[in-house]
Amino acid sequence: AAIRACEKIESQIDRDKLRELMSLMDEAAIQAMLSQIRDAGLLLEVGSCASERQILDAVNPGPERKRLFRRWLDALEAAGALAYDAENGLYCCRVGQTDIAKSWERIEFLGDNQSYGPALLDFMRICLSRLGDLIKGRFDVRSVMFPEGEFGAARAVYSDNIVASTANSIASAAIANIAEKFEKEHPGIPCRIVEVGAGIAGTTPSVIEATRGARLEYLFTDVSDFFLSKARETFKEYPWMSYGIFDINEDVVEQGYLPSSADIILCANVLHNARNISSVLSNLRKMLAPGGWLVFLEPIRRRNYSQLV
């Protein structure tokens, strides 16, 4: 079912243009990361070099942003914009100055052409324009993601773009297929779905639509009651939905959940928050009933633009 859903979506997009768009967004992110070092007066020309300490002192990332900035250095090296000389402990520049504005014009054109999601591109543009403040800790991206307690750009990131909607459709098709088989094998018994780390409910509506008519018990969980409160209002018309606090990094039973209490566990973009993935998977397995399914969505490639924040 998931493969069929994927094939249907693929037939509706221009794969070459979408690849170009993703590549340009990655390149724009690399340009923006490098510009923060150049704005600080380092690595201005091809062949110029600086140590990590010199770069950190010049850019001066905020205390909570140093880890992020080191990820930028790794991304710049992986993209070939910088080369690390291990013998001398220096990062050396391998690319010249580039025009981010010109790259962005093409990104906007392709984004519109492929219906990528204008709100997501707007979010990325805001992040790029505030990158200096962000890396110094003067700008919190959550102010854009959740303005005044609303979801804002969060929906653009997790649901309202072609990549997220495609992934959500594929996961939902798989869950619908599992629920259908469950009903045939267990007539009259509801299929128990537990969504872990459901957050803004980016995937939930797709699952509800795909399983329409199925007999379900749906437990919507997150670590924050903020998201649960929003979900209670959004899904109030579904009496078979319930809500609970759940942390993937804590023991299932100690949090008040019974072993073998789920037939399907859905983890949409949450497993990367695991402190120890083996422990988390073992923990989730406790909750799964025999023959149960774990359905998860996770990126398998780290995109440069996703590392901006």
Question: What would you call each of these model-derived segments?
Answer:
Residues A1-V194, A210-E217, V295:
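N-terminal accessory segments
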Residues I264, G291-V309:
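Conserved class I S-adenosyl-L-methionine
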Residues A262-S278:
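A short SAM/SAH-binding and catalytic strip from SAM-dependent methyltransferases
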Residues V252-I265:
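A short acidic, Gly/Pro-enriched loop at the edge of an enzyme's catalytic core
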Residues S278-W293:
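A short glycine-rich, Lys/Arg-flanked "PGG" loop and its adjoining helix->strand segment in the class I
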Residues P190-V194, A198-V253:
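Class I SAM-dependent methyltransferase SAM/SAH-binding core
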